Amino acid sequence: MSLKPKVALSQDFLLNLSKLPSGVQSKVMKWAILFQSNPKSTSINYENIHAASDTNMKSVRIDGDWRGIVFKPDRGDVYVLLHVNKHDEAYRWAERRKLIINPVTGAMQMIQVEEAAVV
């Protein structure tokens, strides 16, 4: 018996959704409904973000200019829509963040990854 995957929307995503242009908001909501109904759908093309600190961060196409950043687990069944932005900004956002499990509470936490200083 396999359980239905769980889909979550991050606080960052929810706080920033209203700041997106209205035309983009409607595309994001349409995509989010598809994502929520089946995050394993073949119509969702998860793309690797090569410079990402977290290999579970994936890019998804909202339209030609806008990308969603999604946590797609290697194993497990919890998917999270984390962020939406224009292509390059979305990738930069993903490159600087990592989703971890808090060892005390067991909750998912987003951390910002510091760039190592070049000496």
Q: Can you name each region flagged by the protein language model?
A:
Residues 2-4, 15, 58, 62-119:
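Enriched for short, Lys/Arg-rich terminal
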Residues 2-20, 24-27, 31, 46:
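N-terminal "first-domain core" detector
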